[in-house]
């Protein structure tokens, strides 16, 4: 009989691994330190692309990455903000804002997953008690807090930037744990079966709020992490008093890290000189470009002219993008001229979900353009990628400077775990595997550009949203590598995992529960 009967997956938003384990070393996170010293820990857990809340949390909770969600086992969420081309005119998807139909779009995310994947709550089995506390990626949850949109509004009001912000955020942290404990203490109140939940999701978003306002180096950000450590300690202590700790595994991780930019840029010159017009479903339905989001990574959507329906947005061909719009501009050249842009990625024409190519470009320090191609083949567990730089001496991600990574630049196809082992310690870890998965999703942008974090733009669907310098999204390790702790019950072995990926967490928890993962899961159990 399986000893472990309950699993709690806790995501602390916006925590980079190096800082997390440094705070543990300094003695500032004593409860996390205890989990580290008695359970499984990993200092090199690689997140998804791009390193923003969505899709990374979706990938954690489903154990898979994105792709062509219509035809292959994967999830369907490419980014936090994207353009839904299934409609004519297309609709904005922005999980942090109101949508075109004036509904809170975060509630749409469970539908956007598609039905070729499952959340961990679904994987534990029908009829089981499951809980989700402030985590909106919760398909399969028996109980979800906040229970109504009105309570969600009140919760968001609690998290506003006010003079009492710190107090309210600490209150929010405490509430997450208290709600979780109440599901164990008074299960009859929340579930049809009077049993504690077998699987639960927790999301602490307060750390992300403070990082964007003050940066991860600020005392208020670190103080908040210390408070989360405190309430996790309360969770462990109370579960022990209730008699549940010996049969409960607790996983602690983050969705992404963060970085500090030096400057906020302006895209006005790019737009004006290119003759492009921002699309808006109401104000400018005939616009031909949508910048879904651009902080350090920019996601650019363009409307093809090869369609008789003037409101429909098919993906344009690359030849059309080389001579685009009324001015006939080469969009690829123009995007590489944006201040601070160093990298660019796009699909080749004729790609399918089974095979295709992704074209990569890097502008080096001499403004010379370096090129490479990622070939992909297969889907699901058969998916593999091959990385071929045009010049073997100068590759896009600088992998050839490191022996393990350079060994995979051999003109052969390699698996996700081969790329993980070779690149987890580098900038742009796993990118050769993750970029084609992203572009296979028809919801993904036509062209993606990236700075190296020195300059950011803060554009969401064509509008500038803020001027903050504290960000996350790019492929540098500080944004792409997160911590992982798995502990609680003494049944968890004590061991350090040298490297892993965020999609390994769910299959590990399922293995401890004696459950099998869904066919879409690309992660592997760490035990």
Model-found features: residue ranges?
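Secreted, luminal/periplasmic, and some membrane-associated catalytic domains
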Residues: 51-52, 76, 80-109, 241-249, ...
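His/Asp/Glu-rich, glycine-adjacent segments
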Residues: 63-219, 372-425, 444, 458-459
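Short, structured active-site-proximal loop/turn typified by the sulfatase FGly-forming signature C/S-X-P-X-R
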Residues: 21-76
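Short, solvent-exposed turn/loop segments enriched in Gly/Ser/Thr/Pro and often Arg
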Residues: 41-61, 133-143, 203, 522-526
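Short secondary-structure boundary/capping segments
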Residues: 23-27, 145-150, 215-221, 264-271, ...
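Substrate-binding rim/cap in mid-to-C-terminal beta-strand-loop elements of soluble/periplasmic
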Residues: 275-315, 469-512
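Beta-strand elements within well-structured catalytic alpha/beta cores of enzymes
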Residues: 4-20, 35, 60, 124, ...
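A long, amphipathic alpha-helix that forms part
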Residues: 170-195, 207-248, 328-330, 432-435, ...
